[in-house]
Amino acid sequence: MSYYRWLGLYTRRVAKRGYTRDTIRGGASEWDVSRPFSSYVRTLGVLAVHPVRFFELLPKIPDPRAPALFLIFSGLLAAILWLLFGGLFPALVALVLPLPLSSLLAGLYHVGVLGGRYGYVVTWRVLAYPLGFYLPFAAVPVLGPLGAIFVGLVLMPIGLARVQEIGPLRAVLVGLVVAGLVGATCFFLFFA
């Protein structure tokens, strides 16, 4: 009897919906919970070097477990870096903010991809990995803005085009609009 059947995760009903043992555990491109550190480094490397391949292999299922845990793990690392570079309050914000922020940002991106092939949760899955990639870099003074540009204008359009199966021009326009909204919000909150 397999481990998944023993836990009751891989049943006939789950198999009928198209889930496999890999999609329950985390697909080929996803962060693997059983090996958090090595899988985290591998996920960051693939996102940085082969983003098209990462998003092509990303399972298009409405299962938030692996991306949510990836964001939480990224938030922990970001909190450690914020504690070193910014103090206690930014570190606490880095612990609490990733999941609610990802839900809000995914809503903005999903409005732009309405008519795409999949629903909101799949759009959120596309956002979760680049956001988790960005969180630790946000604490480092020079890398923060560069990471935001890379995530918002490179990774997100690639992910939206590949996963939601919308055109690349539309994906870039959605990325530009959301980046403009986020940039304007940050400017008015922190500088104006």
Task: Identify the function of each model-found stretch.
Residues 62, 69-70, 141-142, 178, ...:
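Residue-level signal for alpha-helical context at structural boundaries
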Residues 21-118:
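Selected alpha-helical membrane-embedding segments in polytopic membrane proteins
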Residues 105-187:
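Hydrophobic alpha-helical transmembrane segments and adjacent short intramembrane/lumenal linkers
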Residues 78-101, 138-152, 182-192:
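Membrane-helix interface segments in multi-pass membrane proteins
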Residues 12-14, 62, 132:
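Amphipathic alpha-helical interaction segments
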Residues 15-23, 95, 123-127:
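Short, functional N-terminal and low-complexity linear motifs
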Residues 1-16:
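Soluble N-terminal domains of membrane-associated systems
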